[in-house]
Amino acid sequence: QGWSENPREALIHNLPQGDLLILDLFAECRPKWGIASIFQNDEGYGQHQWLYCMLENFGGNVGLHGRMDQLLNNFYQTQTNPKAAHLKGIGFTMEGSENNPVMFELMSELPWRPTKFGKEEWLKGYVRARYGTNDPTLQEAWQLLGATIYNCPMGNNQQGPHESIFCGRPSANNFQASSWSKMSNYYDPDDILRAATLFF
């Protein structure tokens, strides 16, 4: 797996090409295959085959969250970057499912689209397919979600949706449950409330 320091170069260097398939576990946020990130490996995976994976969900936490722009930008950089020469497909490495289906739909389309597309246009088709109609109110709601809560920005290493403070240690200023997770509003909560009202 491509995560943090793994796989170490000394471990995989002498393995024959084709004997290893590496999953770049968090490629939508912390790609290890060669582009800038806190997990970056300057040499990518060398001669080894690998999959561009979306982690999206940590610990089965339920809540709205996604990185649409990063998912698209990072994936389409593989088309022209020589470090990605041995990319063989995509993978899903989530620690929980049954949430944020829009992100899984978007990820699933990537191998079928040879040229980069914008999330705004893609969301229009997603709404038509999901609801069987081109309702302007639903379109507005999803465009708002795609620009806010489903668009965690580059540089924000938050691991999925906000954690419940009820799961954290008792404290007067508790804002998260895990010590390693970054919890901050990268969107305006009022935009999410507005989007929610558009669904009714």
Regions found by a protein language model. Give the residues of each.
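Short, intrinsically disordered, charge-balanced linker/junction segments flanking boundaries
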Residues: 197-200
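Catalytic-core regions of glycoside hydrolase
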Residues: 1-146, 151-159, 167-189, 194
